[in-house]
């Protein structure tokens, strides 16, 4: 868990005098870091008492073909590119914008697996 409030330091290096301490609502959560594997999800309580489904491992993606308008459930083979971080390719981490190789071909992930709990993608080729 990480505190995500305003920094104690100014841009000049001086300190702000805080009017109050840190609050629990300002704490963020660790990234889900979704891998390729047998489906595993985690439900976490969020602000307002709602639930958020985090995908920890995913085996399949819902791939949409823009030309035909069809959507199919397809097995993910590997991660080919990831603009977020080059190390994510080596670790096979699934994030939004990552290019994955599937049985149908290459696809770009459009959903946020760590926030939505599912993987939706659009076919590139």
From Swiss-Prot:
GO CC terms for this protein? ribonucleoprotein complex; ribosome
Instruction: Note one Pfam family from the annotation.
Output: Ribosomal_S8e
One annotated GO molecular function = structural constituent of ribosome
UniProt KW keywords: Ribonucleoprotein, Ribosomal protein
Q: Known InterPro entries for this protein?
A: Ribosomal_eS8, Ribosomal_eS8_CS, Ribosomal_protein_eS8_arc, Ribosomal_Se8/biogenesis_NSA2
GO biological process terms, alphabetically, are: translation
- Stretches for region Disordered: 1-34
Q: How does it assemble?
A: Part of the 30S ribosomal subunit.
Q: Which PANTHER family does its entry note? A: 40S RIBOSOMAL PROTEIN S8 (PTHR10394)
Q: Which family does it belong to?
A: Belongs to the eukaryotic ribosomal protein eS8 family.
- List the protein's name: Small ribosomal subunit protein eS8
The species this protein belongs to is: Methanospirillum hungatei JF-1 (strain ATCC 27890 / DSM 864 / NBRC 100397 / JF-1)
Q: Which gene encodes it?
A: rps8e
């Amino acid at each position: 868990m990480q505190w995500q409030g305003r920094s104690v330091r100014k841009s000049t290096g001086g300190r702000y005098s805080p009017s109050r301490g840190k609050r629990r609502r300002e704490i963020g959560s660790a990234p889900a870091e979704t891998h390729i594997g047998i489906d595993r999800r985690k439900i976490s309580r969020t602000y307002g008492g709602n639930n958020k489904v985090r995908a920890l491992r995913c085996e399949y993606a819902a791939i949409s073909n823009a030309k035909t308008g069809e959507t199919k459930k397809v097995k993910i083979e590997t991660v080919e590119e990831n603009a977020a971080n080059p190390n994510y390719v080596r670790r096979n981490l699934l994030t939004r914008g990552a290019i994955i190789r599937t049985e149908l071909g290459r696809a770009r992930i459009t959903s946020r697996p760590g926030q939505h709990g599912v993987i939706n993608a659009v076919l590139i080729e």
